[in-house]
């Protein structure tokens, strides 16, 4: 079946991916990325569990020191984004810049194979009609992670296996039990790895961004209160604003130049369209004329009908059939045609 390098986080999903491929006859090599800096991070529970799974399967286990890359591509990316008044999406950036491309490069250069695999819930297929590999949603819609994978390249799709894409999470747990894997009953991660390491996103950001008090204002510029840093807020936020008002107030804009948080009613946080930059058309060639599709503007939001209008400089304008709440600069807008991920990019701004 050939050699495959399996990315192992120490969780049940990647463990089952490795065990399933091993059972199918693949020559499996486990690979764990060492991402976090700081005391105690060299021997995290995930790294220990990944090593145990490889020992259990009788396969080699490699650890790659990716701490500097993670610092540059994720931590610095997050901090600079929040300082600029946007809400970055670290997971898609991490998949592109820290995980998949570097893993495939390591597999080719060090382990002499062109194939990697992970425990992500998504699918890949080749389309002879388009002569391209296509990224698809997973069978388990509740666990589907295609939203975070839109920025992968054709080269990465060509060399990647997603063994869990055709099964449900319940089936993954059952298979883990059948294999007797140590991670079979390990709870799923509930937060970003950074949040799990630091407690909350606020506590993580406060390590890097100095407190800078400013005004909370309404849409007319009237000062309603004070904030301790715009990085503590995100578009659409209602809870934790700290302003008493006759009607619920939502964050509708962050102004890093004036260091202001602008709030308004729910209607003022609704947008009919938005601009998206840094587009990556993962499954199709870049369109030159408008297309009809569906778009997902955050991970747990449903995909909604949209007109996609190509613009210059790798941008598109998305015009929603129905205005959408809380369009957040820095987050991903991922464009689908049914179960196929056409492409995606980073939201740069919303229009009323």
UniProtKB/Swiss-Prot annotation:
Residues holding ATP: 7-14, 33, 119
Positions of region (Interaction with tRNA): 143-145, 298-299
Catalytic reaction equation(s): S-sulfanyl-L-cysteinyl-[protein] + uridine(34) in tRNA + AH2 + ATP = 2-thiouridine(34) in tRNA + L-cysteinyl-[protein] + A + AMP + diphosphate + H(+)
Site feature location: Interaction with tRNA: 120, 331
Underlying gene: mnmA
Protein name: tRNA-specific 2-thiouridylase MnmA
Keywords: ATP-binding, Cytoplasm, Disulfide bond, Nucleotide-binding, RNA-binding, Transferase, tRNA processing, tRNA-binding
Disulfide bonds: 94-193
Biological process terms in GO annotation: tRNA wobble position uridine thiolation
UniProt entry tagged with the keyword ATP-binding: yes
GO CC list: cytoplasm
Subcellular location: Cytoplasm
Assigned EC number: 2.8.1.13
């Amino acid at each position: 079946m050939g050699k495959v390098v399996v990315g192992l986080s120490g969780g049940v999903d990647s463990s089952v991916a490795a065990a399933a491929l091993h059972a199918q006859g693949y020559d499996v090599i486990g690979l764990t990325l060492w991402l976090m800096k700081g005391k105690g991070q060299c021997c995290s529970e995930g790294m220990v569990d990944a090593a145990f799974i490889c020992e259990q399967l009788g396969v080699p286990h490699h650890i790659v020191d990716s701490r500097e890359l993670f610092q540059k591509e994720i931590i610095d990316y997050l901090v600079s984004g929040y300082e600029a008044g946007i809400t970055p999406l670290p997971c898609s950036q991490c998949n592109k810049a820290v995980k998949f491309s570097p893993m495939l490069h390591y597999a080719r250069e060090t382990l002499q194979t062109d194939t990697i695999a992970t425990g992500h819930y998504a699918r890949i297929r080749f389309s002879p009609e388009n002569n391209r590999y296509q990224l698809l949603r997973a069978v388990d819609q509740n666990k589907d992670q295609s939203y975070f994978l839109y920025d992968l390249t054709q080269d990465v799709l060509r060399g990647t296996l997603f063994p869990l894409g055709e099964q449900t999470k319940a089936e993954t747990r059952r298979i883990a039990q059948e294999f007797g894997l140590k991670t079979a009953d390990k709870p799923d991660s509930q937060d970003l790895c950074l949040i799990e390491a630091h407690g909350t996103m606020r506590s993580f950001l406060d390590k890097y961004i100095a407190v800078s008090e400013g005004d909370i204002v309404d849409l007319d510029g009237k000062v309603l209160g004070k904030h301790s840093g715009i990085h503590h807020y995100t578009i659409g936020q209602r809870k934790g604003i700290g302003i008493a008002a006759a009607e619920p107030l939502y964050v509708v804009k962050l102004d890093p130049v004036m260091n202001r948080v602008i709030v308004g009613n729910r209607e003022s946080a609704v947008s009919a369209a938005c601009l998206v930059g840094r587009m990556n058309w993962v499954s199709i060639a870049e369109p030159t004329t408008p297309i009809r599709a569906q778009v997902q503007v955050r991970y747990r939001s449903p995909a909604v009908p949209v007109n996609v209008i190509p613009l210059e400089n790798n941008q598109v304008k998305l015009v929603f059939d129905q205005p959408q709440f809380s369009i957040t600069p820095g987050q991903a807008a991922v464009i689908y045609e049914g179960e196929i991920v056409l492409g995606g990019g980073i939201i740069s701004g919303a229009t009323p």
